Amino acid sequence: MGDFNLVGVIRVMPTDPEVNLDELEEKLKALIPEKYGLAKVEREPIAFGLVALKFYVLGRDEEGYSFDEIAEKFQEVEEVESAEVETVSRI
């Protein structure tokens, strides 16, 4: 997985349960800049059929890497209600 030393978990809430999660996941993956890595994407059931997507994004502890920047890009997508960085951990 390269020389990444951080993993940031970004939780994305779709606008409603009818959103196609497969399409949304692919759309969001395309927004992650190339210098980052993607370890995995998980689906987290919330309530009333709503499912959040959790992106485990790999980065480095150095200038130029910002998980908040990725969350902001995710937030600009029409089907996204919210996107926030839940945690950032060393790996």
From Swiss-Prot:
What are the protein's GO molecular function terms?
translation elongation factor activity
Domain of life of the native organism: Archaea
Functionally, this protein is described as follows: Promotes the exchange of GDP for GTP in EF-1-alpha/GDP, thus allowing the regeneration of EF-1-alpha/GTP that could then be used to form the ternary complex EF-1-alpha/GTP/AAtRNA.
Alphabetic keyword roster = Elongation factor, Protein biosynthesis
Gene of origin?
ef1b
Q: SUPFAM superfamilies this protein is in?
A: eEF-1beta-like
Q: Which family does it belong to?
A: Belongs to the EF-1-beta/EF-1-delta family.
| Protein name per Swiss-Prot or TrEMBL | Elongation factor 1-beta
Q: Which organism is it from?
A: Pyrococcus furiosus (strain ATCC 43587 / DSM 3638 / JCM 8422 / Vc1)
